């Protein structure tokens, strides 16, 4: 099955501590998890690695979020939207369900 949320899509968080925030999808881990830029930040206690000249400390990084907790952001309407699929010129493309506009 084709993915409704892909890398570099702008998404909006629907639930959780970051509800309402928008960000760009950095990575799709599996069919059910994505990493979004600036969303779901966690603190990681990092040990120093002298061989790589990396200092230790507490580092903030993005953690994975369930794909069901995000929705694609439609810039034309300024709201979260749903994704549909259709065939155009023999290719399967994604489109916004609210205004039938093709997603890049």
UniProtKB/Swiss-Prot annotation:
<dbReference type="InterPro" id="IPR003256">
    <property type="entry name" value="Ribosomal_uL24"/>
</dbReference>
<comment type="subunit">
    <text>Part of the 50S ribosomal subunit.</text>
</comment>
<dbReference type="Pfam" id="PF00467">
    <property type="entry name" value="KOW"/>
</dbReference>
<dbReference type="GO" id="GO:0005840">
    <property type="term" value="C:ribosome"/>
</dbReference>
<dbReference type="InterPro" id="IPR041988">
    <property type="entry name" value="Ribosomal_uL24_KOW"/>
</dbReference>
<protein>
    <recommendedName>
        <fullName>Large ribosomal subunit protein uL24</fullName>
    </recommendedName>
</protein>
<dbReference type="InterPro" id="IPR008991">
    <property type="entry name" value="Translation_prot_SH3-like_sf"/>
</dbReference>
<comment type="similarity">
    <text>Belongs to the universal ribosomal protein uL24 family.</text>
</comment>
<dbReference type="GO" id="GO:0006412">
    <property type="term" value="P:translation"/>
</dbReference>
<dbReference type="GO" id="GO:0003735">
    <property type="term" value="F:structural constituent of ribosome"/>
</dbReference>
<dbReference type="GO" id="GO:1990904">
    <property type="term" value="C:ribonucleoprotein complex"/>
</dbReference>
<keyword id="KW-0689">Ribosomal protein</keyword>
<comment type="function">
    <text>One of the proteins that surrounds the polypeptide exit tunnel on the outside of the subunit.</text>
</comment>
<dbReference type="Pfam" id="PF17136">
    <property type="entry name" value="ribosomal_L24"/>
</dbReference>
<dbReference type="GO" id="GO:0019843">
    <property type="term" value="F:rRNA binding"/>
</dbReference>
<keyword id="KW-0694">RNA-binding</keyword>
<dbReference type="InterPro" id="IPR005825">
    <property type="entry name" value="Ribosomal_uL24_CS"/>
</dbReference>
<keyword id="KW-0687">Ribonucleoprotein</keyword>
<comment type="function">
    <text>One of two assembly initiator proteins, it binds directly to the 5'-end of the 23S rRNA, where it nucleates assembly of the 50S subunit.</text>
</comment>
<dbReference type="InterPro" id="IPR005824">
    <property type="entry name" value="KOW"/>
</dbReference>
<keyword id="KW-0699">rRNA-binding</keyword>
<dbReference type="InterPro" id="IPR014722">
    <property type="entry name" value="Rib_uL2_dom2"/>
</dbReference>
């Amino acid at each position: 099955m084709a993915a409704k949320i892909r890398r570099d899509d702008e998404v909006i968080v629907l639930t959780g501590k970051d509800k309402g925030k928008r960000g760009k999808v950095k990575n799709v881990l599996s069919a059910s998890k994505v990493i979004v830029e600036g969303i779901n930040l966690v603190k990681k206690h990092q040990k120093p690695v002298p061989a790589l000249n990396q200092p230790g400390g507490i580092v903030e990084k993005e953690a994975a979020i369930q794909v069901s907790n995000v929705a694609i952001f439609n810039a034309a309407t300024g709201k979260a939207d749903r994704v549909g699929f259709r065939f155009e010129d023999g290719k399967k493309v994604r489109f916004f369900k609210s205004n039938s506009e093709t997603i890049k």
